[in-house]
A protein has these predicted regions:
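Structural preference for beta-strand elements that scaffold enzyme active sites
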Residues: 5-9, 43, 67-70, 102-105, ...
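Short, flexible, mixed-charge acidic loops at enzyme active sites
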Residues: 23-27, 110-121, 219-232
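Acidic (Asp/Glu)-rich catalytic clusters
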Residues: 2-5, 33-38, 51-70, 87-101, ...
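Active-site acidic/histidine proton-transfer and metal-coordination neighborhood
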Residues: 82-184
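Active-site beta-loop-alpha junctions enriched in small/polar residues
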Residues: 13-15, 47-49, 73-77, 109-111, ...
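Acidic/histidine-rich catalytic cores of soluble enzymes
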Residues: 44, 136-246, 296-303
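Conserved, mostly hydrophobic/aromatic
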Residues: 10, 36, 44, 61, ...
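Active-site mouth loops of central-metabolism enzymes
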Residues: 14-27, 76-85, 124-131, 240-243
Length: 303
């Protein structure tokens, strides 16, 4: 429904992976946008192929009748000052806010190994209470700035980064103020060692954005046994779209809807389009979420 407070969007990573150009790097943005629109998605998150100005993004999305969901921001806050980060993030805030986005996808990439072929166990960590407190204080201050720009900071817990495991999410939420929202990503939660539903219920009050990434449990087990890097997890098929993996998205959506969640459900599942064809898998992800919405809350589903 057009005015529904819950909308289904998608990330172009289903067609083209910015970090691994061998996975669909040749696919133009126009293909993703036209196919996503045809499937029924209401909006897209940004990727590296979008224009870099508010006006450019607006024009591209308008051509397809799509909304801007949000866009990833690579932060180095763990290694630099709040003032430096505010200066760096301001243009991204402007681009998002001027195109109607309400949340900013925040990724902490300081020290991250997410793009490197290094075992995930070698990721960066905060080892002391003081380190967590310092980081949390800085993050809260940065979130107040994004809030002043009309955007809720949505912290993306992510493999290969400081906040990866369920206990990291606990520490991050405890160390920050309510200004810092949580981007709940079911796939990263599972691969990071968590029970997605339990983590969601624990931090439900802070969730302001949702990435609907499914996993293939057998591949997850193999990734742990073989100590894969994050890129190896991707190319070997760890992730997939809702309805094609082992995460219970019905329980996740029911929990969100019961709590009155208002925002986007974003299909964001990086895999090799040569193995998992982009259109077919994007369609399956949409159909899964839309059918769940139709059953759980018919007013939110697309006709």
């Amino acid at each position: 429904m057009t005015n529904s407070p819950v909308k289904i969007g998608i990330n172009p990573i289903s067609w083209s992976n910015d970090d691994l150009p061998s996975l669909g790097g040749e696919t133009p943005l126009s293909t993703a946008l036209s196919e996503g629109k045809a499937i029924g998605y209401r909006g897209f998150e940004l990727n590296g192929k979008f224009p870099k100005t508010p006006e450019g993004v607006r024009a591209v999305l308008a051509e397809y009748g799509l909304e801007l969901v949000s866009g990833w921001y690579s932060s180095l806050l763990a290694h630099r000052s709040v003032e430096e980060e505010i200066e760096a993030i301001a243009p991204h805030c402007r681009l998002l806010a001027e195109n109607g986005a309400k949340v900013l996808v925040y990724g902490e990439v300081a020290g991250s190994i997410q793009g490197r072929r290094i075992a995930l166990g070698e990721r960066p960590r905060f080892y002391t209470d003081e380190a967590w407190k310092s980081y949390g204080d800085k993050l809260t201050r940065l979130a107040r700035f994004t809030q002043s720009q009309g955007l809720r900071l949505a912290y993306h817990h992510h493999m290969g980064a400081y906040v990866q495991a369920p206990e990291d999410i606990d520490r991050a939420m405890a160390a920050t103020g309510e200004e810092v929202g949580l981007l709940f990503d079911a796939g990263h939660c599972y691969l990071g060692g968590g029970d997605p539903l339990a983590v969601l219920r624990k931090h439900l009050a802070r969730v302001c954005h949702v990435h609907c990434k499914d996993v293939r449990a057998g591949v997850v087990k193999l990734s742990r046994n073989e100590q894969w890097s994050f890129p190896e997890c991707i190319v070997n098929g760890t992730f997939t779209v809702p309805g094609d993996g082992d995460i219970d998205f019905e329980a996740i959506l029911a929990t969100l809807l019961t709590a009155g969640y208002r925002g986007w459900l974003v299909v964001e599942a990086e895999q090799d389009p040569a193995v998992a064809p982009s259109y077919a898998y994007a369609k399956k992800g949409f159909a899964t979420l839309n059918s769940l919405l139709a059953r759980l809350a018919p007013q939110h589903a697309s006709a």
